[in-house]
Amino acid sequence: MNAEAQGQKSGKSSPTKWIVAAIAVVLVVIAGIAIVGGGSDNGSSNDSADGGSQVTTPPDGSAASGGAGEFQPVTATGEALPMLEESVPAPGSDPAEGTAAPVLSGFDFDGAPVTLAPTGKPMLLVFLAHWCPHCNAEIPRLIEWKESDQMPDSLEVVGVTTGSRDDQPNWPPSQWLVDMEWPWAVMADSENQDAAYAMGVGGYPGLVLLDGDGTVLARRSGEASVSELNDWVAAALPSA
């Protein structure tokens, strides 16, 4: 999550810096992407998602759910992926491509276990924030992609609700996904966004495409049309 820098002189903000900040906001909106943690007013960083650090886990390698809830503990096993710096990286430019994604163990909103591990089939992880306008725009496209039979039959899709805030629109995320008619499995991220940080998600919606053995094929963030989703998956997964 990017922290805003405010310049001050004689108790007033610099007009030039206000203009720069306004331009930055416009560019983010045009890009169709919400910055990770955009629902918060406080800046934060992810020290564990620099690509060279190990995601920490409890001594027994597991986490226990406290029952039903909008936030659930997440255990990640493996190295965190580097933070995605571009919304749509050129093929081969994402340092995470070709590396093993960490295995995520967590729970759904009801407290039922959910494990995101290799299944032998390609998997698409979709990181969503309930307050994100781009996520709200993208979910209907993903559903259209599925219902129009353009999505590869072998592709498994899992939604991960993250960056949740009870002071933001569409709270709670569990009801939001019901209202949006989300048809796939769901993992609820922790309040610390452990799942998102482990996968190096830099914006919402964040998409992480994995091969059947858990290898990262491609990542992207921001809105995508059905045709763009088709092209993106086909380029990363030729057999799709």
Label each PLM-derived region with a short phrase:
Residues 121-122, 137-161, 226-228, 234-235:
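Conserved helix-turn-beta segment immediately C-terminal to the redox Cys motif
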Residues 129-134, 163-167, 191-194, 202, ...:
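Solvent-exposed loop/turn segments at secondary-structure junctions
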Residues 174-213:
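Short, internal strand/loop/helix patches
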Residues 1-100:
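N-terminal targeting signals for export/organelle localization
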Residues 152-170, 182-191:
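Thiol-based oxidoreductase modules, predominantly thioredoxin-like and allied folds used
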Residues 113-136, 142:
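Short active-site neighborhood of thiol/selenol oxidoreductases, capturing the structured segment around
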Residues 121, 150, 203-240:
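Thiol-/selenol-based redox modules, centered on thioredoxin-like
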Residues 95-96, 103-123:
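A short beta-strand-turn-helix
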